[in-house]
Amino acid sequence: MRVLSLFDGICCGHLALERAGIKIDSYDAYEIEKNAIKATETNFPDVIQHGDVTKEDFTKYKGKIDLIIGRSPCQGFSSSGKQLNFNDPRSKLFFEYVRAIKECQPKYFLLENVVMKKEWQDIISSYLGVEPIEINSSLVSAQNRRRLYWTNIPNVTLPEDKNITLKDILEDIKFPNPAAIRGRRLNKATIVGRRLDENGHRKDTDKTIPITQCLEVRATNTDKSNCLTTVDKDNVLTPLPIGRHPDAFKNNLPFRYYTTKEMCRLQTVPDDFLNMIPDSAARKALGNGWTVDVIAHILSFLPNEYKEDKTND
């Protein structure tokens, strides 16, 4: 299979193709982040890097590409972002993906993005000519990660639930003061900046109140993590009960971030997949990346002609 990957990141698409049993004849990638490129060059030396999608004339690939894959930057659509939709320069990169499809005319395509307002979803669908399928990564990993997938690969269905929970992927990491929290279960939480009055009530519109970083525990269900992002404090573990706990850092509240190895497991990539780049870059790349087993599941519906011949193994 001849593959064109836009906004390639850490090349999760290549790994997913391998897991789906797809024979890769060529893999051309467009990515500008240096650490992501370094990871790809180490893990997949066959990948040809091309740089910035906005500077490419994709007509050179016309008739030469079987599959275009990509996840155009989602911050403009995300509920955790400012939701600027198509006015956000990052979201406008979606149209580079559309341009690539028009210019190289692949047989198949796959685009991933966040769950968004229906009006924006419909705009993307109108350009791609298909409706998306929504898949939560929780079916194949220990992470809640709802995403939309637009593809013309036929007959894609939801993956079976692998029943993977956090206890299956967490390392044995001790808190600084285990005696103080002995016997308590870990709850998933976030650290959020809030403006609180003297009674601890939210007054977010009152700019005279300083922002305090609150550890917020909203549920005791720890079967799945929150969705990974590029911000560590969006996703933490704590033994504290449900509620809002102010001054998380100042009061040295007991919590910990997911380790990079745990984040790899949440995105279903090998533990050592990003050992060659700085830890901070690896964590950001994982927050931006694909859940590989979801992508592999979708790609498994490609026609058998693209799959590795195992008869001679």
Segments predicted by a language model, with ranges:
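Conserved active-site and SAM-binding loop architecture
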Residues: 1-313
